[in-house]
Amino acid sequence: MSDKITVGEAIARTLEQYEVSAMYGIISIHNLPIADAVGQRGNIRFVPARGEAGAVTMADAHGRFSGLGVALTSTGAGAGNAVGAMIEALNANTPLLHITGQVEKAYLDADAGFIHETRDQLGFLRACSKRAYRVNSAEQAVAVIQRAILDAQTVPCGPVAVEIPIDIQSSLVSSSVLSQPVAPAPLPAASDEAVERLYQRMKQAKRPLLWLGGGALACADAVRKLADAGVVVISSTHGRGILPDSHPRSLRAFHNSPSIEAILTQCDLTLVAGSRLRSNETRTWTLPLPRPLVQIDIDPAAANRNYLADEQINGDCGALLNALAARLSPGEKVNAEWDAEIATAIQQAESALRQQSGEYAKLNDAIAAALPQDGLLVRDITVSGSVWGSRLFRAISPLCNIHSLAGAIGMGLPMAIGTAIAN
């Protein structure tokens, strides 16, 4: 019995090893060996799309919940159609694998007019991805796929593209090319020195502020403990729900509200955890943030990108926030008068937003009443994305309120489909 399998089957088996449950895509002559193998084996659900942007968007949503989304597209125009959705996944730091085809090896980069050929496909994939790879030999295909998955799942996560020439996809290789999945390295533990410095800053502050971003999505328990201890919490739109709106010290995502800005000006410490401090949440970086400002991010390149920090801590938000929460006593920073000011400011911010939203506030309330308490809201951009959906609609847990971070229009429906399948 031969141990030979096609590269397409080797890729399908590899994805199964990574416990991929769904692949989103469009079947084409330039990816048939992979699509055939997935279909014939029957272990991965293939979800067809009407366009490549929709396929990658569905995979993006799936990856946000499952830890790895997978999309399959065609060469040239097909891969190009995926670019906008890849940019969204890049903004959201979604662990996503985008597999696309290429013309036969003999015609690569020849600009010969081969069907589906485009100039510098790898170049535009690099521009919209965390990493992009080309498979140059059949024997290396599985290794490159594993490298791509490792890159996608390594924090900070992101979409990774792999292009595979069609003749390589159909080539036969020994099943010995298959190997065990490679897991990302564990995140670093919080250093005692960094935790001690954070604790001393927190101890000295009377009105500390915690600003959360998408990099803190897995930190809900630590954030709640800090809020219970008296720390005021505000989040990016992507970070909403890490601390439920119902918590009395949650400023939600009311960054641009005058009443909330008045609260921020009274804080005497800002701890930024896993946030880019994006332009639309900081009035294009003119919003004054309380000093001292300490930034926690796993990515050293995040340091001082938009605001000059008094201290940058390169590390895992979860490890550092958990260690800090363990040092604070319950209610250590609680102040009844301060809590009353916070409650008034939140009420004023919500009232002003309801007035600004007009009839949309009624739509918001109707959806909230119809949706189960643990239901998920997925929305498009424009009014639902930028006004009532991002700030008024309730958020009770991380990723319960999905939106476009890149500002792309039209991603709502495929994002909702991917979210539903992942859940």
Where would I find each of the regions flagged by the language model?
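Thiamine diphosphate
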Residues: P33-Y107, L269, G274-R278, S386-N423
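A cross-family phosphate/adenosyl-ligand binding-site feature
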Residues: S2-M58, I166-R197, K225-G241, D245-Q266, ...
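Phosphate/pyrophosphate-binding active-site segments
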Residues: M1-D3, E139, S175, Q200, ...
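Glycine-rich beta-alpha junction loops
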Residues: I27-H30, V103-E104, I164-S170, G214-A216, ...
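Active-site diphosphate/adenylate-binding microenvironment
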Residues: G8-E19, I26-I29, I34-R41, E341-A422
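Structural signature of the thiamine diphosphate
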Residues: K4, S21-A22, R64-T100, R126-L178, ...
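Glycine-rich phosphate/diphosphate-binding loops that line cofactor/substrate pockets in enzymes
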Residues: A10-V20, A61-S66, D151-P156, A194-L209, ...
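Glycine-rich, anion-gripping cofactor-binding loops and their flanking helix/strand elements
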Residues: I44, R64, G214-I296, R394-N423
